[in-house]
């Protein structure tokens, strides 16, 4: 079972992703967070396998949350979800510890593929 934490300040986005993942055998959404602070807190308490992390959120954003989760929970793997796909942004998030990068326009098949790749120890860009 791949345990996933969804992090996005838009409830509609979290709900949509949850619906996709709930239909995939072997995936379980174990929590949701609407900002980076709650994502770090949840990750420290529950150690999800994968965090799907939005970058632009009020308060602590995705970059800072990714750094903190990588520091405190090195076994948790992070896939960044964002609308910003222009260089050097993908390289930057991978350098700070993210394991994967997806644009928010990616289809459900690509999201599932990214989660499986990252869970298997590979990087996904």
Predicted regions and their residues:
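Short hydrophobic/Thr-rich beta-strand motif most characteristic of the beta2 strand and flanking loop
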Residues: 26-34, 42
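Receiver (REC) domain active-site loop signature in two-component systems and cognate sites
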Residues: 57
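Acidic catalytic/metal-coordinating carboxylates
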Residues: 35-38, 61-64
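Active-site residues of response regulator receiver
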Residues: 8, 54, 82
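Active-site beta3 strand of CheY-like receiver
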Residues: 46-52
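Conserved acidic segment of CheY-like receiver
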Residues: 1-13, 17-21
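C-terminal output helix
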Residues: 88, 106-119, 123
């Amino acid at each position: 079972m791949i345990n996933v934490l969804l992090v996005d300040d838009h409830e509609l986005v979290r709900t949509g992703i949850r619906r996709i993942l709930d239909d995939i055998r072997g995936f379980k959404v174990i929590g949701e967070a609407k900002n980076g602070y709650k994502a770090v807190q949840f990750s420290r308490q529950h150690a999800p396998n994968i965090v799907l992390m939005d970058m632009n959120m009020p308060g602590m954003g995705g970059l800072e949350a990714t750094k903190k989760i990588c520091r405190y929970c090195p076994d948790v793997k992070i896939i960044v979800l964002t609308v910003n796909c222009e260089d050097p942004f993908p390289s930057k998030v991978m350098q700070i510890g993210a394991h994967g990068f997806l644009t928010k326009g990616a289809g459900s098949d690509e999201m599932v593929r990214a989660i499986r790749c990252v869970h298997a120890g590979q990087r996904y860009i």
